[in-house]
């Protein structure tokens, strides 16, 4: 019997055919994972993966992230019996003590096989989120001290931008006004901004992730946390009691800071967020 390599193919060999399909699937899975992991806004600190419950939560800065992290950490310790938030993983990584980090294999599995998981996230009115970012990072920063994520390069860049465009806020130790902040954001590309004020559809990677449910911060935060925790095996009674305690509250600026001009600018920046998440473009009044 002679072996004709030119006429031999996987088509007539079920075993080889299966191997080829399996290899193709592995490459496809890898591409899916890299498509997410390579994003600017992907971070394990913003992703809760519970493989056992087939549940993934993508956190969205300025949309209840600190509250959710605190609740998740408490739930893992008090209800799920974890020895620490991340079950001892990443011992030298301080953040892993304050948020449940999964194993690398579990992150890979979730994004390689997304059809096996339910994905969840929270969104917020773009005007409210934008105002909150400025108040928390700049108004309060100017008054009480800038957070680590703002002082240094980012603050210098904004002051340099203000100077080159003859806008207020360029002088060191002065407040960066909301109007200058919005203009600075407007000068940057979607997906390239700081995650606290970048467009939410980029932060949440909606083009790559199919969400089972998207909860609005306005009126759906408690419902969302309760539903997600229920999937993790956490009783509603525990979640309800845990959420009765005050959540993370930043110092607020109660007066309205949006003008029609600034609202128009913000509406243009966050146009897709308004459309995708169903927010009213005229909801800026009073903010």
Predicted regions and their residues:
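Membrane-interface amphipathic segments in extracytoplasmic regions
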Residues: 2-287
């Amino acid at each position: 019997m002679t072996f004709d390599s030119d006429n031999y193919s996987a088509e007539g060999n079920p075993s080889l055919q299966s191997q080829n399909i399996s290899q193709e699937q592995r490459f496809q899975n890898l591409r899916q994972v890299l498509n997410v992991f390579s994003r600017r806004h992907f971070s394990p600190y913003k992703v809760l993966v519970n493989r056992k419950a087939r549940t993934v939560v993508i956190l969205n800065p300025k949309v209840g992230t600190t509250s959710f992290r605190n609740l998740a950490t408490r739930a893992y310790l008090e209800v799920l019996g974890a020895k620490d938030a991340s079950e001892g993983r990443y011992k030298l990584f301080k953040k892993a003590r304050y948020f449940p980090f999964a194993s690398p294999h579990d992150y890979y599995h979730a994004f390689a096989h997304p059809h096996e998981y339910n994905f969840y996230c929270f969104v917020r009115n773009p005007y409210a989120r934008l105002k909150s970012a400025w108040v928390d990072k700049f108004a309060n920063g100017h008054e009480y001290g800038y957070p680590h994520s703002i002082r240094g390069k980012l603050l210098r860049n904004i002051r340099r931008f203000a100077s080159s465009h003859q806008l207020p806020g360029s002088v060191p130790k002065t407040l960066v006004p909301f109007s200058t902040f919005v203009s600075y954001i407007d000068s940057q590309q979607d997906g390239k901004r700081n995650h606290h004020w970048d467009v939410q559809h980029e932060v949440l990677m909606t083009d790559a992730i199919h969400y089972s449910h998207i909860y609005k911060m306005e009126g759906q935060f408690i419902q969302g946390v309760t539903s997600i925790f229920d999937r993790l095996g956490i009783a509603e009674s525990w979640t309800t009691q845990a959420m009765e305690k005050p959540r993370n509250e930043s110092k607020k600026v109660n007066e309205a800071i949006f003008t029609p001009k600034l609202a128009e600018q913000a509406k243009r920046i966050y146009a897709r967020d308004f459309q995708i998440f169903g927010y009213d473009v005229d909801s800026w009044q009073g903010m």
